[in-house]
Amino acid sequence: VEALDQHYDTIISVDTSTPSVMSESAKCGAGLLNDVRGFQRPQALQTAADSGLALCVMHMQGEPDTMQTAPTYSDVVQDIAEFLSQRLAHLGAVGIDLDRVVIDPGFGFGKTAEQNFELLARLEVLSNLGQPVLVGLSRKSMISSVLDRPPEQRMVASVALALMAVERGARIVRAHDVGATLDALSMWQTT
């Protein structure tokens, strides 16, 4: 993180759920902490507050090694909205300025392909939570459920999903194919 911070004029995001890694990352020049567990581990909330960094709160059902084993929701979009709303309340309760916080619905993290597409179709519901919505749809396996393509052949579909997400309220798009995604978004925004 230190080397990246010294060589690049950009915000460095560190993906971690471990409070000690959060603290060290903040000391080394990270600009954003991205926690797939939504800052739920012991001491994660306070460590995030103490860091002063921007935060990305993500939804994930289950744990990484079991999250894709029969994920179940009563209503995938409402359940995720409620989870993120509760996490935002917890962040605020420890003194975190919510202007520092973005939310990520966690496409592909404890969701079936059908649940991911339902989430994308109704993504604007999450915009109502008042925080910028970040999406990571690039090369996701949900694409292969429709197109049956390996990850390296999912660029066009990934760009299409990014456009759909922005149209439905996403403000930050995580992408593998940055140039293609940026070109498509630039063209889309001209109309």
State where each predicted segment sits.
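Active-site metal-binding loops of divalent metal-dependent hydrolases
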Residues: F107
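Conserved C-terminal portion of the radical SAM core fold
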Residues: V94
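Short acidic capping loops at alpha-helix termini that bridge into adjacent secondary structure
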Residues: T10, D97-R100
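Active-site-adjacent loop and "lid" segments of alpha/beta metabolic enzymes
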Residues: E2-I11, T16-M22, A26-K27, G31-H90, ...
